[in-house]
Amino acid sequence: MSTEPRHPQVPVGPLVASIGAVLVIVSLFLDWYDQITGFTVFEFIDLLLVMLALATIASLVGGLGLVRSAPSPGVALGVAIFTVLIVASQLVNHPPAAAGEGGPSKDIGIWLALAGSGLMVVGAVLGYARISLAVEARRRSDEP
């Protein structure tokens, strides 16, 4: 057994991807098209995006060692790319609920979802590098 103190490590890739996943979930509460939120405009895609985001957050939980097994980096990358494709498809092809003359204007929610899904991809790619931050607690010295 090693007598060295063990420093908790935070995996950078899953952390970045999880921040992106939270942005995707938050974006669904915001307007995607002309005062229509993501949860209002979609029938199934909103639930799919939430499930993909939660799967990404599960990779962080696994990387922190809070559950037994973490999803492989390949699965995390596949989930992230699928999320980007779904969000990008909504930029190109508007859902029927948002269709109208000349098409609806895009609002902050869709752009936040695109940024969040992009962060998910960046985090999944960083997950392959297995970069982590070590956290070390030090005592304060009594002398100024």
Describe each PLM feature range.
Residues 1-144:
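Compact integral membrane and secretory-pathway proteins
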